Curated annotation (Swiss-Prot):
GO molecular function: aspartate-tRNA ligase activity; aspartate-tRNA(Asn) ligase activity; ATP binding; catalytic activity, acting on a protein; nucleic acid binding; transferase activity
GO biological process, one term: aspartyl-tRNA aminoacylation
Classification via PANTHER family: ASPARTATE--TRNA LIGASE, MITOCHONDRIAL (PTHR22594:SF5), ASPARTYL/LYSYL-TRNA SYNTHETASE (PTHR22594)
Organism lineage: Bacteria, Bacillati, Bacillota, Bacilli, Bacillales
InterPro entries tied to this protein: Aa-tRNA-synt_II, aa-tRNA-synth_II, aa-tRNA-synth_II/BPL/LPL, Asp-tRNA-ligase_1, Asp-tRNA-ligase_1_N, Asp/Asn-tRNA-synth_IIb, AspRS_core, GAD-like_sf
UniProt catalytic activity: tRNA(Asx) + L-aspartate + ATP = L-aspartyl-tRNA(Asx) + AMP + diphosphate
UniProt protein name: Aspartate--tRNA(Asp/Asn) ligase
Site residues, Important for tRNA non-discrimination: 84
EC number: 6.1.1.23
Region (Aspartate): 200-203
First-level EC class: ligase
Source organism of this protein record: Bacillus cereus (strain ATCC 14579 / DSM 31 / CCUG 7414 / JCM 2152 / NBRC 15305 / NCIMB 9373 / NCTC 2599 / NRRL B-3711)
Length: 591
């Protein structure tokens, strides 16, 4: 078999007159009265191959048996197309290959999905036949971008003198965070490893070990409920460094991301990226990962509402809640009563009891609550919301958390429905100064907002023992277009501070020692100040490639129920395998 001389998508007018050897898949076959045209495809693109009896009867006879997705080896001569046959939409659209020989390397059954960017296959079918789905050019281009992003990051970190170090996949289960995937030990009866949710502890121990600058393209595993932008196994760019301040870490990440955007996407973004404190993000956008590609900020009306004529507003403020509003500029005519009812049901999903609304017309406010506002209140309301005729005003009165969640989600929905989001924009943002701890009323305890190893502000360390809810974290999240790309922090590196953190989280001294004794001891041997960040590679590629689902950036992903339709994992195992592990199954009975 002769060696391939050209990739299909790389045959251009410069090759006219040359004999070429091509190998690839049949994208399309057309029989035009004695001539057969085949579009031959490989990962670089498509080239048209012509089978003509005047060139080779033998090749034509073989071509008559060929169908879509057959794998071919074609030998032929490159010729220019006639004027009427030129296709400038293809890189190879000015030439075609006159076939002299063809060899079928492998036949193919009729495929269950159309191998094209605009395939009509359902996602389940695409996942079941993932190896066929991956043949689509849009999928290859996505993974080419993933490769380019990873290569750029590796090259950048190498120039910054970071070492790539692999950390264990079989590790210790810890109680914080999401559920672990557990792996039973055959050697140690009744004991289990856990697959890592992140390399957090090991990368900190590498700092204790004096490596100073570490990174890893790390596989991570979390047994949590899935959604469009979550997978049970995922990849993060994990970075840690000693002796750097928060500003130095953020500056380095900005330089890295601007290079990624330029090299992998061809887009120039400016640095430094804007910074916003967590409290401001929640107040202005109702989100800790605000999409700043469009305006429409939340406006706090609590002071006005405390003394207005609308009892729903006043009672919310009196009970310690708040009232906030969104002004959807020019949207009054675009939303009917039925549409607003749909928005009301939408905010109820986020805990809101309802959605109050007003439309601004030339002669004043109109809507079901307009009667509660006199002329003076109406003027204050319009002035505060900068409202003009044609605007739609939307209000939620409730607990602060409910107001933020519901209006934050509503803002994003309106942004999409009103086409306010410029898809060509890439707006990076740092969200800083996070709360260190969050209180869970159901569990009646504090949880770490990021993780238990985040350094509080120095002046807040004592608050861990007196008022944990007031302690601030030296933490930072990187946001792109409303998606959290990753998060990081400066880390605790002193035993006494780490013990205070564990105590605030409800750990007894014995529990802390049992779970994290190795880390606490390490902190007694001269641990340097350190910090870092973990960036979600899958999510970054999803955004840069213009995909809407993380599954499109992972070669062999899981479904929303964490199953693989291709291999049918997870699956039962043989009884003998369980016996080797000294395990017995006790399955719940189906009701």
């Amino acid at each position: 078999m002769a060696e391939r001389t050209h990739a299909c998508g790389k045959v251009t007018v410069e090759a006219v007159g040359q004999t070429v050897q091509l190998k690839g898949w049949v994208q399309k076959r057309r029989d035009l009265g004695g001539l057969i045209f085949i579009d031959l495809r490989d990962r670089t693109g498509i080239v048209q191959v012509v089978f003509n009896p005047e060139t080779s009867k033998e090749a034509l006879e073989v071509a008559e048996t060929i169908r879509s997705e057959y794998v071919l080896h074609v030998e032929g001569t490159v010729v220019e197309r006639g004027e009427g046959a030129i296709n400038d939409n293809m890189a190879t659209g000015r030439i075609e290959v006159q076939a002299t020989k063809v060899n079928v390397l492998n036949a193919a059954k009729t495929t269950p999905i159309i191998i094209a960017d605009d395939t009509d296959a359902s996602e389940d079918v695409r996942l079941k036949y993932r190896y066929l789905d991956l043949r689509r050019p849009v999928m290859f281009n996505t993974f080419k971008m993933r490769h380019d992003v990873t290569k750029t990051i590796r090259n950048f970190l190498d120039t910054e003198e970071f070492l790539e170090v692999e950390t264990p996949i079989l590790t210790k289960s810890t109680p914080e965070g999401a559920r672990d995937y557990l792996v039973p030990s055959r050697v140690h009866d009744g004991e289990f490893y856990a697959l890592p949710q992140s390399p957090q502890l090991f990368k900190q121990l590498l700092m204790v070990g004096g490596f100073e600058r570490y990174y890893q393209v790390a596989r991570c595993f979390r047994d949590e409920d899935l959604r469009a932008d979550r997978q049970p196994e995922f990849t993060q760019i994990d970075i840690e460094a000693s002796f750097l301040t928060q500003d130095e870490i953020l500056d380095m990440m900005e330089r890295m991301m601007t290079k990624v955007m330029k090299d992998a996407k061809g887009v120039e973004v400016s640095a430094p990226f804007p910074r916003m404190k967590y409290a401001d993000a929640m107040a202005r956008y109702g989100s800790d990962k605000p999409d700043t590609c469009f305006e429409m900020e939340l406006t706090d009306l609590s002071e006005f509402a405390a003394d207005c004529g609308f009892k729903v507003f006043t009672s919310a403020v009196e009970s310690g809640g708040q009232v906030k509003a969104i002004n959807a500029k020019g949207a009054a005519s675009k939303y009917s009563r039925k549409d607003i009812d749909a928005l009301t049901e939408f905010v109820k999903v986020y805990g809101a009891k309802g959605l109050a609304w007003l439309k601004v017309e030339e002669d004043g406010l109109k809507g079901p609550i307009a009667k509660f506002f006199g002329e003076e209140d109406a003027n204050v309301l319009m002035s505060t919301l900068e409202a003009t005729a044609g605007d739609l005003l939307l209000f939620v009165a409730d607990k602060k958390s409910v107001v933020a969640d519901s209006l934050g989600a509503l803002r994003l929905r309106l942004g999409k429905e009103l086409e306010l989001i410029d898809e060509s924009k890439f707006n990076f943002l740092w969200v800083t100064d996070w709360p260190l701890l969050e209180y869970d009323e159901d569990a009646d305890r504090y949880f770490a907002a990021h993780h238990p190893f985040t350094m509080p502000f120095r002046e807040d360390v004592e608050l861990l023992e007196t008022a944990p809810e007031k302690a601030r974290a030296q933490a930072y999240d990187l946001v792109l277009n409303g998606y959290e790309l990753g998060g990081g922090s400066l880390r605790i590196y002193e035993r006494d501070v780490q013990e205070k953190m564990f105590k605030a989280l409800g750990f007894s001294q014995e529990e802390a020692q049992e779970q994290f004794g190795f880390l606490l001891e390490a902190f007694e041997y001269g641990t340097p100040p350190h910090g870092g960040i973990a960036l979600g590679l899958d999510r970054l590629v999803m955004l840069l490639a213009g995909r809407t689902n993380l599954r499109d950036t992972i070669a062999f992903p899981k479904t929303a129920s964490a199953s693989c339709l291709l291999t049918e994992a997870p699956s039962p195992v043989a009884e003998a395998q369980l016996e080797e592990l000294n395990l017995k199954l006790s399955l719940k009975e189906e009701k």
